[in-house]
Structures are given as structure tokens and as C-alpha cells.
Amino acid sequence: MNAAYLQLFEQIWNDASKLQEVTDEVIENITTVYNENSPDYLYFVTLYNIFNEFLEDVSEDVLPNEATGFKESKIWGMLYNFQKDAALAIINKLEKYNGCILADSVGLGKTFTALSVIKYYENRNKSVLVLCPKKLANNWNTYKYNYINNPIAADRMRYDVLFHTDLSRESGNSNGMDLDMVNWGNYDLVVIDESHNFRNGGKISGENEKENRYLKLLNKVIRKGVKTKVLMLSATPVNNRFVDLKNQIALAYEGESQLLDEKLNTHKSIDDIFKQAQTAFNTWRKWEPEARTTS
């Protein structure tokens, strides 16, 4: 048997048609291994090898369309690089998942980042509503009016600004708009400033079974009329329960958890995932401080 294998080896070894010159390839591979590559190069190679399986999920359908000219806008030019990265990521998530939470800390410019996203959708001829607490009215009005203190007046922003409390009103005027005439269901994008105010979810209470603001938002703005994307801004999206976050995320899929389950293609429902996370957190919180690690 050994003699037969040896004869076969000799036959192949002496057959020039079966030989392949690999010297140059071996030298190239060895050289690559021993090259002194920059830290940046090694960093990006590492990122690629970790995340390359997710690249197939990225398509031109969900990437920002630069042909809209939003990168030539005044607001875009005023952003820091980290805000530009955030804006592009937000647009991607709005297109792919229909919703996004921008949860940067106070002072990191969430308003300006959101304005750049609004500009992107306005350039696509989309109708945008900003819902904010009444105390923040001037914060948003400044950037849409032709005021001398408006640094982005050249962008001619045209979004509407209404208040959280307006969701429960049926008449009267608010921020220069007649609430009798507002077409709540005609907004392609709603930006909710301080979205943590909607963390308690939908409830019907009282003898007359009145909807709370959360349900008003779902039924008047998100579920009704055109398909509405939801951008939420909050430095504190979670108070002390994970359900706070779940209720806000639910706004992006019209309160129907199965819609998000289908989009994420998870093995468990989003409701079960949050319940499991809350249980794990409650257990962790009871441990002694020295035992509370993230490992």
C-alpha cells in the first residue's frame, strides 16, 4: 500500500501540468503579515472582521440620498463630525426601522442633529411635525422663522411646531396654528422632543374612558393618514424601568410589537426581551455593590 502511495506521489510530482508556482504568493503573504501597519489600518481591519456579516444588511434603499443636497445646507455645515455621523445613522434607522431614539446627554446638540435630519426630509418634500413641551417652543421656533437671530435662516425650514399638551386639545390656537384645522395624520416625520414624557405608554382612564397623550399620539398622528416616521429626542429615555424604553420604541411601529419582531427577526418577541432584561436587572440590583459587575 505504501509503495502505491509513493508511486502516485512521484507521478504527480513529476507531472509539470499539475505544478503551480506559488513562491511569489507566499512571499507576498509573509510580507503582509510582517508589515508595520498603522494603528488606523489595524483598527479598521478589526472592525471589518467583527462586523462584516452585517454589511449585507446595508442597502442603498436605507442610506441617505446625498442628491437631496442636505449636505450643502447651512445646518449641516454647523454640525460637529460626531453630529454628522449621528444624523446619517438616524436617517438610516428611520428608513429601515421607521423610528430612532437620539439619546445623547444634555449639551451635545440633539436639537441641531435633529434639525439636519429634518432638513434631509424637507428636501425630499416631506411634511414634518415637531412635538415638544411648551417651555421649549422658542428653542424650535427660532430655527424656522426669518429672524435675525436664526443662524440657519438660509435653510428656510418649514416644519410645524406643536406641544405635547396639544394632543389632548380639540380646538383653539397653539403656536400660531388653529387646532381645529390641523391635519394630524398628514406628517411624514414627527420629531418628539423630550420623548421620555411618553414613557408610560397608552392608558384609558376616568369615567369617560379618555385616551392619554400617548394614545392620542398613536391614533391621531402615527396610525392615521400617511405612514409616519418617528424620531425621539431624550437624554433620559429610561427612568427606572426598561418598559419606559419599550413604550417609546413602540411609537415607531404603531404600538404593534409583532411589526418590530418581524423587522428585527428575533427569536423572541420584543416584549419578552424587555421582560427578561428587567428581570435580570432587578436581580443584579439586589446584589452587594462589590458584586455588581458588567462581566
Where are these regions (language model features)?
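ATP-dependent helicase/translocase motor core
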Residues: 1-105, 112-124, 199-209
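SF2 helicase/translocase NTPase motor core
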Residues: 67-78, 111-115, 119-226, 256-295
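Residues that form or flank phosphate/diphosphate-binding pockets in enzymes
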Residues: 97, 109, 139, 240
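Conserved Walker B
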Residues: 105-106, 194-196, 235-237
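Conserved helicase ATPase motor motifs in RecA-like P-loop NTPase domains
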Residues: 225-241
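A short helix-turn-beta junction within AAA+ P-loop NTPase domains corresponding to the substrate/partner-engaging
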Residues: 245-258
